[in-house]
Curated annotation (Swiss-Prot):
GO terms for molecular function: ent-copalyl diphosphate synthase activity; magnesium ion binding; terpene synthase activity. Its cofactor is Mg(2+). It is found in: Plastid, Chloroplast. It comes from Isodon eriocalyx. GO terms for cellular component: chloroplast. Pfam families: Terpene_synth. This is Ent-copalyl diphosphate synthase 2.
Amino acid sequence: MSSSSNVTSLPRLTTAGGVFPREMVRVHSSCNILRSKAKVGGINYFNPGNIKCVEVHKSRQVAVAAVKSLEYETEKPTNQDVVSEKMRVLSERIGTMLQNMNEGEISISPYDTAWVALVEDTDGRPQFPTSLEWISNNQLADGSWGDRKFVIYDRILNTLACVVALTTWNMHPHKCNRGLRFIRDNIEKLENENEELMPIGFEVVFPSLIEAAQKLGIEIPHIDSPCIKKIQAMRDFKLKRIPMELLHKKPTSLLHSLEGMQGLVWEKLLDFRSDGSFLCSPSSTAYALQHTKDELCLQYLLKAVKKFNGGVPNVYPVDMFEHLWCVDRLQRLGICRYFRAQIKEMLDYVYKYWTDKGICWARNTNVQDVDDTAMGFRLLRMHGYDVSTDVFKQFEKAGEFCCFPGQSTHAITGMYNVYRTSQIMFDGEDILADAKNYSATFLHQKRLASELVDKWIITKDLPGEVGYALDVPFFASLPRLEARFFLEQYGGDDDVWIGKTLYRMPYVNSDTYLELAKLDYKKCQAVHQLEWKSIQKWYRDCKLGEFGLGEKRLLLAYFLAASTAFEPEKKGERLAWAKTAFLVETIASQQLSHEQKREFPNEFEHGSSLNMENGGRYKTRTRLVEILSNTVSQLSFETLVAEGRDIKQQLSNTWQKWLKTWEEGGNLGEAEAQLLLQTLHLSSGLDESSFSHPKYHQLLEATCKVCNQLRLFQNRKAHDAQGGISDLVIGTTFQIEASMQELVKLVFTKSSEDLDSITKQSFFAIARSFYYTAYCDAGAINSHIYKVLFENID
């Protein structure tokens, strides 16, 4: 058939560059596999599967114009511009928030404000009159003080503290009476409240507050009730366990609740201040100021009262906490790519104050906790900062881990973050291996007992967060899969933290983040759904179903690509990944004789060569070879248009290597990983010098090794399942985990002469996709595919 036969006329195409001349474009209408063909630099490029197929005999610019014009013709009108503008506004708003981060945005605590209001100046007057004013102005309609989230521990503690402060200064007796009425009507509810919702130190400070109220002549209703007696007994038990000599010997978490203690030796305790405060606690520091008149304590409180216009938070500053948890939320919501510069600044800030013992919620503190330390370690390591596992030593004793050294109880979220951190261990990091075993066991037990209620946060779906972490380990957690689940688990503005009182962190829990994340997800999902239709068309036009694999396998291939390289601008990489993976599986599934296998790569090689030499008129004897050749041409053409680079010969050579391995019965998992990686890198326009970089070869070797292990493991699982063996070991193997740890170390560590982070991450992305399919069962995978690609976001 001549190149001019069966050509239908095409109207002139209007492009951004003007009118596209009719004589430059011809549309073929009689091919089994429709083609667009562009002759650029003397080479014909085929594009199988297009609705309209263009043969262009001009420059690359002309080819680009034709493709863009045809794409424009098939676009449907959408509200894309409106959505894009909304996303731009939200991104700018969030960017401004992140740039303005300082010592932490946090809500005010009536309890701590009351303790500050109790401080006298040298003349016996209120040292902080604006704190009394804040109390007066912030009583709730029911007579209580506290967060809008009703937790009886929080409301009773805040309300009694404010009543004590106002009564001390003989102010607003009617407000005091309303507060006491609230206490009388609600105090017995303490009996039935979940103890996990009890604020930090409540059992110590609440009885002390009752005693202070009684000294003022305030009658506390139901003082002899069982719930009050129980709390007092808890206080006595805890104080007996506190070695006072230890309290005065070195900094401990007890510095946070000094207002609930007796017999303190202030001369010794003053040595434990940090930035003028006792563990960043305004109430504890105010109590110290009452007894010592210490100038540094005064300056700390003056600064806090000024910043918060009379009120004070339950803890301040919270800069390390805010920086880290903000980065974590942005990452898990899938929108961190919009804020790379700000995230680097935030992590640089954290690293500046990182210590060999870990960190706490604020910089320069003399006490560390495992929750902030684990979160910091995890994020810093994942972004290439050099951090040592020695920071966890003080939190471990005989294989058990605690939040503060010597503490016996655990918070769910503390162990949850230890567990998440333990999964990015490098080979040989035994303390993280111990942390993983301990935290995983703890979380599994809590889940089985339906006790996933945290003592540090009231969040929308903590059981869902913990369940996802346990069911989908880090090595299997595809980025878009994690984001899709977290969009449902993240509560935004409604999430509230538990400290000495309930408090909120607007730069950590934000509806603005959630709104942008949902818009971003919907935008990406819409792109993915259109691409899925186009790849289905490719499958049907090529009649690939005749080779034995259904669209379900194609959908899995596309899901893995779209869940990893999900950004709209990565269309070329997604389609190249999905089509390559599916063709690999299709070819490998064919029952061919040794002779047929030997002919296949030869025919592909000669067919590819002839296609380039004679305009594509060479007809291969094997239709599958023809489909492969045309797909390679299509992917090459699309990369030429997008990146301005001719990759056809390199892509053909990469396929030849895989076909040779397949023909010889070699390690197909290893060969497939190499094929996918090089296809991705070629399609993305990766600089050619990167392919010869020493680190590239290290990463390629490590990735191919673990992918081969995973594919063998997956095949064995499938074989065992077919044989009726159902009691498979949960997880993978020690060798696989060690190989993944080796790869993770190469990806997450930086060297003086290194590849860029995005390229290194692509190796982990391919390994992760192999791990995912090897680890997750078919039912889970099917539900994930539906959820990520097709389920609507509310």
